[in-house]
Amino acid sequence: MTKVITRFAPSPTGMLHVGNIRAALLNWLYAKKHNGQFILRFDDTDLERSKQEYKDAIEEDLKFLNINWDQTFNQLSRLSRYDAIKNLLLDKKRLYACYETPEELELKRKFQLSKGLPPIYDRASLNLTEEQAKKYIEQGRKPHYRFLVNHEPISWHDMIKGEVKYDGKALSDPIVIRADGSMTYMLCSVIDDIDYDITHIIRGEDHVSNTAIQMQMFEALNTTPPTFGHLSLIINKDEKISKRVGGFEIATLRKEIGIEAMAIASFFSLLGSSAQILPYKSMEKLANQFEISSFSKSPTIYQPEDLERLNHKLLISLDFDTVKERLKEIDAEYIDENFWLSVSPNLQKLRDVKDWWEICHQTPNVENLNLDKEYLKQAAELLPKGEITKDSWSIWTKEITNITGRKGKELFLPLRLALTARESGPEIASVLPLIDREEIIKRLTSA
């Protein structure tokens, strides 16, 4: 059996967002499940927009998610190889020189659209005589090159979409070499996939028409194409998510919002599939349950609040030995197991534990909360004597009810506000033993 080799090929022209991290996750998981290899390739032929800082940020995000690669390379290191294939395809008459300026091409496109026609290149340059081409060169025009798409049926079996069929006549010959000599994504990608023995490619369905053209490129290079799977697009409020329109960046999710790595990995590797989205604790366990056949063809709706709920579920499922290492990463190694177990059931983000440590160890500011001071002083007098335990809350509130007649929110909300300055959070029964008894009385009587 052929060894499974997948790849993820981001362009270092921006930060990773939830759309392309999904492709990275699924390619990694597919390779992992089949004991294969995963290759990281940087499509950096866009010289104007590609930046080292984006490459570094992409690698940082992947490492955070425990997406490790067996090999990595960038396309700029392979220009001589691409040039050799360019010459081969020119000899085979599958590449041809074009001399239109960007402005001329835009006019053609607008004219076609105004007539209700698809903006397919008219192959005007394919029919140029040598004299006409020479005249353009004398004018100082530099040629760009297009791949000649044969006007014949194209089909393949897609891992997600099933049978996909295209008519070559409906596809425009793509530009594969720009006028400045730089290569575009289309042909370089095929050459790389051939040279690195890529067997499976999972990517967004916005690449389906590209795949149809690339099928002919593989054929032109006498190679069997990889097996493709095209994921439905992730949408949020009826818009496709992409980095060019301000998609949700992974760096933002992990650094600013505080989502755990395995929450991100679990969520986006299961989103759009028939599998239940659960908070897996390791990439290995996630890979074991991964099934590419479970993914839907329909658009996938991403709701950030669903990810935050999953993050909460993950946090409360973690044992303290696991949490200890994460606490070091956020400079909170002073948190002990007892404190963690007391507050973790209500944490939304790991960093929230630092806030609750501060609340329990420093008197909060409640000056602007307009609390009922008489009630709080009365409650302080009724606080059970001796050591404060988890049972103290129920004993205390029963006594308060007996004396004041207060119940429910009228009883507990003023106490919560006076003790924590928060309307919500961990159960007060759990928080109470974390605060020194004298401090509890101080907070109640000075509110």
From Swiss-Prot:
<dbReference type="InterPro" id="IPR008925">
    <property type="entry name" value="aa_tRNA-synth_I_cd-bd_sf"/>
</dbReference>
<keyword id="KW-0648">Protein biosynthesis</keyword>
<dbReference type="InterPro" id="IPR033910">
    <property type="entry name" value="GluRS_core"/>
</dbReference>
<dbReference type="GO" id="GO:0004818">
    <property type="term" value="F:glutamate-tRNA ligase activity"/>
</dbReference>
<comment type="function">
    <text>Catalyzes the attachment of glutamate to tRNA(Glu) in a two-step reaction: glutamate is first activated by ATP to form Glu-AMP and then transferred to the acceptor end of tRNA(Glu).</text>
</comment>
<comment type="subunit">
    <text>Monomer.</text>
</comment>
<dbReference type="Pfam" id="PF00749">
    <property type="entry name" value="tRNA-synt_1c"/>
</dbReference>
<dbReference type="InterPro" id="IPR004527">
    <property type="entry name" value="Glu-tRNA-ligase_bac/mito"/>
</dbReference>
<dbReference type="InterPro" id="IPR045462">
    <property type="entry name" value="aa-tRNA-synth_I_cd-bd"/>
</dbReference>
<dbReference type="InterPro" id="IPR000924">
    <property type="entry name" value="Glu/Gln-tRNA-synth"/>
</dbReference>
<keyword id="KW-0067">ATP-binding</keyword>
<dbReference type="InterPro" id="IPR001412">
    <property type="entry name" value="aa-tRNA-synth_I_CS"/>
</dbReference>
<dbReference type="InterPro" id="IPR020751">
    <property type="entry name" value="aa-tRNA-synth_I_codon-bd_sub2"/>
</dbReference>
<keyword id="KW-0547">Nucleotide-binding</keyword>
<comment type="similarity">
    <text>Belongs to the class-I aminoacyl-tRNA synthetase family. Glutamate--tRNA ligase type 1 subfamily.</text>
</comment>
<feature type="short sequence motif" description="'HIGH' region">
    <location>
        <begin position="10"/>
        <end position="20"/>
    </location>
</feature>
<dbReference type="InterPro" id="IPR020058">
    <property type="entry name" value="Glu/Gln-tRNA-synth_Ib_cat-dom"/>
</dbReference>
<keyword id="KW-0030">Aminoacyl-tRNA synthetase</keyword>
<feature type="binding site">
    <location>
        <position position="243"/>
    </location>
    <ligand>
        <name>ATP</name>
    </ligand>
</feature>
<dbReference type="Pfam" id="PF19269">
    <property type="entry name" value="Anticodon_2"/>
</dbReference>
<protein>
    <recommendedName>
        <fullName>Glutamate--tRNA ligase 1</fullName>
        <ecNumber>6.1.1.17</ecNumber>
    </recommendedName>
</protein>
<dbReference type="InterPro" id="IPR014729">
    <property type="entry name" value="Rossmann-like_a/b/a_fold"/>
</dbReference>
<dbReference type="GO" id="GO:0005737">
    <property type="term" value="C:cytoplasm"/>
</dbReference>
<dbReference type="GO" id="GO:0000049">
    <property type="term" value="F:tRNA binding"/>
</dbReference>
<dbReference type="GO" id="GO:0005524">
    <property type="term" value="F:ATP binding"/>
</dbReference>
<keyword id="KW-0436">Ligase</keyword>
<dbReference type="InterPro" id="IPR049940">
    <property type="entry name" value="GluQ/Sye"/>
</dbReference>
<dbReference type="GO" id="GO:0008270">
    <property type="term" value="F:zinc ion binding"/>
</dbReference>
<keyword id="KW-0963">Cytoplasm</keyword>
<feature type="short sequence motif" description="'KMSKS' region">
    <location>
        <begin position="240"/>
        <end position="244"/>
    </location>
</feature>
<dbReference type="GO" id="GO:0006424">
    <property type="term" value="P:glutamyl-tRNA aminoacylation"/>
</dbReference>
